[in-house]
């Protein structure tokens, strides 16, 4: 039996749209991208949506923005970020690249989301942020995470690449932190 490695999954309409973009000379950040960003922001009830080539780039951009000297209160080298141990290198490495120290904590065995009790136990005077990953469509307990971050004046940044369309108490994932 022959099982193909891959197959063409694009419809003719999608191919035509791609060719239209290529012919326009605007293959990145063009009118179609701007229209899609606007539509996605409306869909997700967000003020803004900015598209990048990957979640990895989004993570890097977030940490570099937070350490940029022109930001209202830039994070200083040595800041700590609480992250789940079930993670990716592209979650951890941008923190390190921007001068931070990742602090790994346990995850819930049922959801693979960051364990809230572990987050609370890991908070130190150097903790600047909590960076939960929302794996496989599972949204973390955002009520508790938000309350913890508010109580300790810690930044909350969600990595919601895997929860597109998921909601927590009616609110779209990705809309709880920065």
PLM feature segments, named:
Residues 68-135, 139-151, 155-160, 167:
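PLP-dependent aminotransferase-like
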Residues 5, 27, 114, 164, ...:
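Short clusters of hydrophobic/aromatic residues that line enzyme substrate/ligand-binding pockets
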Residues 24, 46, 125-126, 151-152, ...:
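Structured helix-beta-strand junction loops
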């Amino acid at each position: 039996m022959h099982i193909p490695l891959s197959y063409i999954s694009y419809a003719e309409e999608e191919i035509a749209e791609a060719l239209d973009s290529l012919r326009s000379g605007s293959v990145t950040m063009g009118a179609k991208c701007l229209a899609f960003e606007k539509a996605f922001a409306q869909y997700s009830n967000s003020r803004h949506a900015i598209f990048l080539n990957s979640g990895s780039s989004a993570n890097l951009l977030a940490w570099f923005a937070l350490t940029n000297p022109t930001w209202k209160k830039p994070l200083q080298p040595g800041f700590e970020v609480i992250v789940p141990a079930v993670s990716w290198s592209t979650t951890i490495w941008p923190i390190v690249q921007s001068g931070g120290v990742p602090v790994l904590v346990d995850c819930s065995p049922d959801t693979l989301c960051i364990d809230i009790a572990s987050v609370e136990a890991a908070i130190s005077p150097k903790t600047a942020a909590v960076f939960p990953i929302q794996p496989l469509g599972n949204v973390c307990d955002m009520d508790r995470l938000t309350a913890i971050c508010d109580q300790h004046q810690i930044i909350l940044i969600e990595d919601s690449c895997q929860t597109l369309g998921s909601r927590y108490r009616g609110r779209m994932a990705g809309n709880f932190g920065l």
